[in-house]
């Protein structure tokens, strides 16, 4: 694992996740596509007393920033703030994209081929694990099993069925064959935020998954639309890493919109972006309190 800070008492991501598992708390993961949001996330994490933070770029976000640029930016912010920050390639969907992130210096990769038949999903995850291990055995690899519906946006309603959930016996087989470090599973969670229905996790189902396959670090994706209590209950049941994205985007968007409404003639970017980043920072601080 690449160390971004010269004097920080460094630990591997796997060690932070293991400590979270043993301590029954979770490490936060927050996506970014701009420097100000990255700084807001890291600043909030450091001020909250969280042991570390994960930041992620989706394929779209990394396409906007640039994969090597994202690595350089995270490295600079982590060093400047003297705080452990781990950069994750979030839901990369092909081996080639995962390889590009690994070669550029990402600390972690999610190979998301959950849309494929299980055998193909296993083969893809195994290929990424084997390549990552050959480059640096400390790079953390996450697989995904189950149908995680939605996108990182606000929608009215998304139909959720137990048939979409990750099946405990399949998760156990996936972990056994691939050797992934982390697992993203589906038990009522969705990507994005819905306005006309209540999102609710099926905690008993998740507990069955943990019993069937206790080894990996379990990851909750799509936490933006969930209640704080649902997130807390998932952590009690074994979640050690929680992803937020849509809520950050909404907070950023809404504050920029507010700034333009209040000051329609303002054209200096930092004068309307800085308040938006501050709103993101407040939101991240709240989420990190929930994860403790």
Stretches found by the model and what they are:
Residues 15-17, 35-56, 60, 69-80, ...:
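Alpha/beta enzyme core
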Residues 8-28:
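N-terminal amphipathic alpha-helix/helix-capping segment at the start of soluble metabolic enzymes
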Residues 25-33, 58-62, 271:
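A short N-terminal beta->alpha junction/helix N-cap motif
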Residues 26-31, 53-56, 85-90, 109-111, ...:
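Hydrophobic faces of well-ordered beta-strands that scaffold small-molecule active sites
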Residues 66:
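Conserved, carboxylate-rich catalytic/transport cores that coordinate ions
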Residues 226-292:
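C-terminal alpha-helical cap/extension of soluble enzyme domains
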């Amino acid at each position: 694992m690449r160390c971004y800070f010269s004097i920080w008492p460094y630990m591997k991501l796997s060690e932070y996740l293991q400590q979270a598992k043993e301590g029954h708390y979770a490490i936060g993961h927050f996506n970014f596509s701009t420097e100000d949001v990255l700084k807001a996330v890291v600043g909030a994490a450091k001020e909250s007393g969280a042991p570390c933070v994960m930041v992620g770029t989706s394929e779209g976000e990394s396409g906007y920033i640039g994969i090597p640029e994202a690595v350089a930016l995270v490295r600079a912010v982590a060093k400047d703030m003297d705080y452990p920050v781990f950069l994750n390639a979030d839901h990369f969907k092909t081996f080639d994209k995962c390889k590009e992130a690994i070669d550029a210096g990402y600390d972690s990769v999610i190979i998301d081929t959950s849309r494929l038949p299980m055998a193909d999903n296993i083969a893809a995850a195994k290929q990424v694990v084997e390549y990552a291990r050959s480059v640096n055995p400390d790079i953390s690899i996450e697989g995904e099993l189950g149908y995680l519906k939605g996108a990182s946006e606000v929608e009215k309603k998304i139909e959720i069925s137990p048939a979409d959930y990750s099946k405990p016996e399949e998760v156990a087989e996936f972990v056994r064959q691939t050797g992934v470090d982390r697992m993203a599973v589906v038990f009522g969670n969705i990507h994005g935020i819905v306005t006309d229905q209540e999102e609710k996790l099926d905690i008993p189902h998740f507990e069955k998954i943990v019993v069937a396959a206790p080894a990996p670090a379990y990851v909750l994706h799509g936490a933006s639309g969930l209640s704080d209590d649902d997130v807390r209950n998932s952590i009690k049941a074994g979640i050690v890493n929680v992803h937020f994205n849509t809520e950050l985007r909404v907070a950023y968007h809404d504050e920029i919109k507010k700034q333009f409404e209040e000051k329609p003639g303002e054209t200096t970017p930092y004068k309307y972006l800085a308040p938006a980043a501050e709103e993101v920072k407040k939101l991240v601080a709240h989420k990190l309190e929930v994860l403790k």
